[in-house]
Design a protein with these regions (language model features):
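Phosphate/pyrophosphate-binding active-site segments
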Residues: 1-2, 294-389, 508-585
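N-terminal cofactor/phosphate-binding cores enriched in small/glycine residues
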Residues: 5-73, 79-81
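Active-site diphosphate/adenylate-binding microenvironment
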Residues: 8-16, 26-30, 34-39, 350-429, ...
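Glycine-rich phosphate/diphosphate-binding loops that line cofactor/substrate pockets in enzymes
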Residues: 11-20, 62-67, 155-160, 199-212, ...
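Structural signature of the thiamine diphosphate
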Residues: 22, 65-74, 80-82, 90-97, ...
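Glycine-rich, anion-gripping cofactor-binding loops and their flanking helix/strand elements
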Residues: 82, 216-304, 400-428, 442-445, ...
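Thiamine diphosphate
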Residues: 100, 107-120, 396-582
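Glycine-rich, acidic loop regions that bind phosphate or pyrophosphate groups
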Residues: 100-149, 243-349, 451, 473
Length: 586
């Protein structure tokens, strides 16, 4: 019989799946739920040693002798401190010791609670990985607990062996921690990592998947090897490859697609319609908001990640395999093992939805400006964008696959886009372009103090505020929005550039913009800054209108009762009233 405490169930299940059976136990209350659950499980071999210092050294010797991971389990507070000497020894000698340290409620720390010290990462510098596991109260806690324990156990022998710490929090409800009322231990998700693998067996899994979705994150495929490997992969498997512009995969293959605004307009019903059996991801950050829907609505999906450093990235909450290698090597190896063919059924599901995406006639706004700008970008241009609207809208609008797109989307900060762009531009002979907002430019204005090359082209959209906050809230919801939240201002960038090394241009409407862009993309003696003036609230409304125009049903797809009600409301109220209600309701 096992405890019903979820975090302990997850821990026990993963210890069994990682084949970690030896546990050296010291007495205590906090670890009672764990100890009582494993002592009658024939899988585990338990040893009782009262003194924690001695127990840890005993486990050290056992692990060294058997060349397998060995756990030590103790109660909270100073009991855990007694593990220090053996943990340090294990770290220096590369021995797989697992410190299972039970802990108190963290909210009570330093508030006169008995036996309560700071145990989180207490062995810092002496362990390869330390995780702090909360008590599981909801699905998010469960996912986090599962992920953290997987990460710790995977690190035991990743690029060399060594000790890890799993610190888990327990209540002091004596009845709860001493109740064992679960007959069958629930099996939790295990994550496997491969530095080398049997690609034939991996291919056998892939070929049985009917709906395979490959997702490409930010990346730069300089040689084209990844593109070529993906092209062959799409021919052999029932898959779709989705890459935003920042994946920089230049291919005319129709099965390698940019979902553009789909993540912002897709419904729960459509997520179910497009739900994959398996996701294979590569690259860094994937910007499309599709990634937020998959954990919520795609309940039957498995995720494999390809990443060179082997780091765990469980962004879709369903990661089961990590392949520590270059993505082109993975796909090439799979291609060599495969003789299948894409039946295109899953591809046509995506194509049917993407073919419905369109730009309606746009009022003059930042979306209209960015669309026009992207349309005139030359082939092979280098484009750097700031975060949020610049990334989002350029991803909607860029149609030339050879445009190289970059942005600081790792930490997604507003502050350093200009400096990053100027650094990139130094090594380029052709014109290089920056798409930036007014606040982002002001953040980084001192970057313009250096001498600039004539190939610099900066298009700044000045809507006198942070447009993202107008999209999120709007003046109807927060009338004082521009005072502080959106940082409203009356600054014209022209005033910062007069007398500088720039050739300055400006536009206030579409006709002027088209005229200025003709000169903007031509070589010149000086760098050029083009300032385009829009209005923040109008920009937000234009984006919302674009989203609503593209919230359409897929022909022949079953829709939920909730979706049907929304459709009727929109028809009765009209688009303008419906949109207002949709974006202002709490």
């Amino acid at each position: 019989m096992y405890t019903h405490i979820k975090s302990v169930q997850i821990l026990i299940s993963l210890l069994k799946q990682f084949n970690i059976r030896h546990i050296v136990i010291s007495p205590g209350t906090r670890n009672t739920a764990l100890v009582g659950s494993i002592e009658n499980d024939v899988f585990f071999k338990c040893y009782s040693i009262v003194d924690e210092r001695s127990a840890a050294y005993f486990a050290l010797g056992l692990s060294e002798s058997l060349d397998v991971p060995v756990c030590v389990s103790c109660t909270a507070a100073t009991a855990t401190c007694n593990y220090f000497p053996a943990i340090k020894e294990a770290y220096e000698r590369k021995i797989q010791l697992v410190a299972l340290t039970a802990d108190q409620n963290p909210y009570e720390m330093f508030h006169m609670e008995d036996q309560c010290i700071d145990q989180v990462d207490m062995f810092h510098g002496y362990v390869k990985k330390a995780v702090d596991v909360p008590k599981v109260m909801n699905d998010s806690d469960y996912w986090y607990c599962n992920r953290c324990i997987n990460e710790a156990l995977l690190e035991l022998n990743h690029h060399g062996k060594g000790p890890v710490q799993i610190n888990y929090h327990m209540s002091y409800n004596l009845n709860e921690i001493s109740t064992y009322d679960v007959k069958k231990l629930p099996i939790t998700r295990k994550i496997d990592r491969y530095e080398v693998c049997d690609f034939k067996s991996i291919e056998n899994i892939i070929k049985n998947k009917k709906r395979l979705l490959v997702i490409g994150g930010s990346n730069f495929d300089k040689t084209g090897k990844l593109r070529d490997a993906l092209n062959r992969f799409t021919e052999k498997h029932n898959c779709v490859v989705i890459c935003d512009t920042y994946a920089n995969i230049y291919s005319e293959n129709e099965k390698i697609i940019n979902p553009r605004a789909l993540g912002d307009v897709i419904t729960q019903d459509q997520i179910s319609y497009l739900e994959p059996d398996l996701i294979i991801s590569f690259g860094a950050i994937y910007y499309s908001t599709i990634k937020y829907f998959i954990p919520c609505y795609a309940k039957n999906t498995e995720h494999w990640q390809i990443v060179e450093d082997g780091m765990i990235n469980d962004g879709y909450h369903c990661l089961t395999k990590v392949f520590e290698m270059r993505p082109e090597d993975f796909f090439n190896q799979i291609n060599q093992c495969s003789n299948g063919m894409n039946n295109e059924e899953y591809f046509h599901c995506w194509k049917k939805r993407l073919d419905m995406m369109h730009f309606q006639k746009l009022e003059f706004s930042n979306l209209a400006v960015i669309r026009e700008f992207c349309n005139v970008l030359p082939d092979n241009a280098l484009l750097h964008t700031t975060v949020l609207d610049s990334i989002r809208m350029s991803n909607y609008a860029i149609t030339k696959p050879t445009v190289r797109c970059f942005a600081n989307i790792g930490a997604d900060g507003i502050d350093g886009a200009l400096s990053t762009y100027l650094g990139q531009g130094i090594g380029e002979e052709e014109l290089v372009y920056l798409l930036i907002g007014d606040l982002s430019l002001m953040y980084d204005m001192n970057a313009l103090l250096q001498k600039l090359n004539s190939n610099i082209r900066i298009l700044v959209i000045n809507n006198y505020a942070g447009a993202e906050f107008h999209k999120n809230f709007g003046l109807e919801r927060i009338p004082t929005l521009n005072n502080y939240v959106a940082a409203g201002h009356n600054i014209k960038i022209a005033n910062c550039c007069i007398g500088s090394q720039f050739e300055y241009m400006m536009a206030t409407n579409m006709e002027e913009l088209k005229d200025r862009l003709k000169e903007f993309i031509k070589p010149s003696q000086k760098p050029i800054l083009l300032e385009v003036f829009t209005e923040a609230d109008s920009d937000a409304n234009a984006l919302k209108a674009y989203w609503n125009e593209n919230r359409e049903e897929i022909p022949g797809m079953k829709i939920s009762a909730k979706a049907k009600i929304k459709k009727v409301m929109k028809k009765i109220l009209g688009s303008n009233v419906y949109n207002c209600l949709l974006y202002t309701s709490p």
